Amino acid sequence: MRILISNDDGVNAPGLVALHAALADYADCVVIAPDQDKSGASSSLTLDRPLHPHTLENGFISVNGTPTDCVHLGIHGLLERQPDMVVSGINLGANLGDDVLYSGTVAAALEGRFLQRPSFAFSFLSRQPDNLATAAHYARLLVEAHEQLDLPPRTVLNVNIPNLPLEHIRGIQLTRLGHRARAAAPIRVVDPRGRAGYWIAAAGDVEDGGAGTDFHAVVQGYVSITPLQLDRTCQDGFSSLNTWLEGLR
């Protein structure tokens, strides 16, 4: 089996190196990742310039683009032999609840949705790699066990691992996405020439983090695993929308 590994923290990120090391003796692993940090890139594609893959000394391939660019190239022609599945991460920082809408880590996994096997997005609840071995352990465990899964086509599994030593993890919980409150207002700054600029501020506080959510699971010391799908159609809105449209005719 061949696994395409990518991330949004960049090709030299410790989480990517740890993920590759965890899977290297399980499958033929190919790493294609952004040449710099692309956190928050979501599913964006680069359309205003060419992409230039560059093979590094360790065999990893860096690309001057987004995580989605990297997986797109890997699946659609850059590799002589197409991968069987996509595994993204290990992100240093959580991707919980609404975070998945912005996450380049999750987006890389979503780009692998056309392959025959589920894609995985792994995130670690710390910006520091102290307990990264815990995340690598669960990445290997879940990827190796995927062959026993019977999931709908194009399913992506979003996995978040607490920042704990392995022996302190309480288990794995199947979860739904929680929700955050509205994000903080952008931070206004003024440069030396008097021009105003803005920094995107922190994500909103957890608003829906009760039992059953990914937020709740990781706080309780569990690895959370949330199945995601591409179809964002709001079926619950069909009835009221049909009534509304009837009134417009």
Curated annotation (Swiss-Prot):
Nucleotidase that shows phosphatase activity on nucleoside 5'-monophosphates. It is found in: Cytoplasm. The keyword Membrane does not apply. NCBIfam families: PRK00346.1-3, PRK00346.1-4, surE. The keyword Ribonucleoprotein does not apply. GO terms for cellular component: cytoplasm. It comes from the Bacteria. A divalent metal cation binds at residues 8-9, 39, 91. Belongs to the SurE nucleotidase family. It comes from Pseudomonas syringae pv. syringae (strain B728a). This is 5'-nucleotidase SurE. One of its GO terms (molecular function) is 3'-nucleotidase activity. The gene is surE. Its EC number is 3.1.3.5. Pfam families: SurE. Its cofactor is a divalent metal cation. Binds 1 divalent metal cation per subunit. Gene3D superfamilies: Survival protein SurE-like phosphatase/nucleotidase. It catalyses: a ribonucleoside 5'-phosphate + H2O = a ribonucleoside + phosphate. Keywords: Cytoplasm, Hydrolase, Metal-binding, Nucleotide-binding.
